[in-house]
Amino acid sequence: MGVIKKKRSHHGKASRQQYYSGVQVGGVGSMGAINNNIPSLTSFAEENNYQYGYSGSSAGMNGRSLTYAQQQLNKQRQDFERVRLRPEQLSNIIHDESDTISFRSNLLKNFISSNDAFNMLSLTTVPCDRIEKSRLFSEKTIRYLMQKQHEMKTQAAELQEKPLTPLKYTKLIAAAEDGSRSTKDMIDAVFEQDSHLRYQPDGVVVHRDDPALVGKLRGDLREAPADYWTHAYRDVLAQYHEAKERIRQKEVTAGEAQDEASLQQQQQQDLQQQQQVVTTVASQSPHATATEKEPVPAVVDDPLENMFGDYSNEPFNTNFDDEFGDLDAVFF
């Protein structure tokens, strides 16, 4: 279906701007002409002056003619707004070509490209040796990678051309290789350069002739008795277990004492808190203690109450809960 072109109508905002853009009138103000069908206030008044006995524009406009012209002009404006805002009929709605031209051009381009691709795939004979693999990287990416490779090679060459930075102990290493300095002198030189290091000369002490130290390190070298594994070993093992049990009991006793101390401390704290609460309540209600100390009068049975029976002990039941118990529970 072809698209029918139609003359573009004025937009609502543009038409209102055109409607209210007035022409400067001397002594009256700015009154705008909507279009050729809606005149201005001045021209409308001049045309209607003849109805009231005036002889043209030279006779001027009085207040009555201006009021009538203003009323007629307002009426024409209202009629114009009413016609402008009236909805169009569905049969008369036709799209403008500019609304669909971009979509149509894009659709036509896609159709032509897909048709060419399909024809190339179905009709064109391509030799197998002409079919090449697709590129893994685009040309832009390949150029970037080649540039980075060139920069890395340049940096490596520059590093090789730079002179070697002397190490911290270069002179000492050279002296050690030449043998011109003794080991002790080189060690002293290292400690002199690194002032944060410290050492103590002759710090190693050799105890070759100390029998007590040697005996402690070697242990007891005496031979065990013949009945060691039958009798002595059992005694040693029993002593070991007894010592271990004593240590355990001591730890348990210390733990129990600590728990009792913590429990007593907690009880004291609770007692202090209760005393504070009682003191606070007593200070807030001074008449409470006096009320509690007052004697309670004894209940004396009235003979008139027992005249018709002891109704106070009988259950009071009106069957209200059986009928309206659920309703009462809802409200209360």
From Swiss-Prot:
User: Where is the motif Nuclear localization signal annotated in this sequence?
Assistant: 2-8
Question: Could you tell me where this protein is found in the cell?
Answer: Nucleus
Q: Which UniProt keywords apply?
A: Activator, Nucleus, Phosphoprotein, Transcription, Transcription regulation
Q: Which GO terms describe its biological process?
A: chromatin remodeling; maturation of LSU-rRNA; nucleotide-excision repair; positive regulation of transcription by RNA polymerase I; positive regulation of transcription by RNA polymerase II; regulation of transcription by RNA polymerase II
Spell out which residues are annotated as carrying Phosphothreonine: T165
GO cellular component terms, A-Z: chromatin; cytosol; nucleus; SWI/SNF complex
Sequence segments annotated as region (Disordered):
278-299
Task: Tell me the superkingdom of the source.
Answer: Eukaryota
A Gene Ontology molecular function term of the record: rDNA binding
Misc remark for this entry? Present with 2900 molecules/cell in log phase SD medium.
Subunit structure, as described in the record = Component of the SWI/SNF global transcription activator complex. The 1.14 MDa SWI/SNF complex is composed of 11 different subunits: one copy each of SWI1, SNF2/SWI2, SNF5, SNF12/SWP73, ARP7/SWP61, ARP9/SWP59; two copies each of SWI3, SNF6, SNF11, SWP82; and three copies of TAF14/SWP29.
What does this protein's UniProt record list under function?
Involved in transcriptional activation. Component of the SWI/SNF complex, an ATP-dependent chromatin remodeling complex, which is required for the positive and negative regulation of gene expression of a large number of genes. It changes chromatin structure by altering DNA-histone contacts within a nucleosome, leading eventually to a change in nucleosome position, thus facilitating or repressing binding of gene-specific transcription factors.
This protein's name: Transcription regulatory protein SNF6
The coding gene here is SNF6
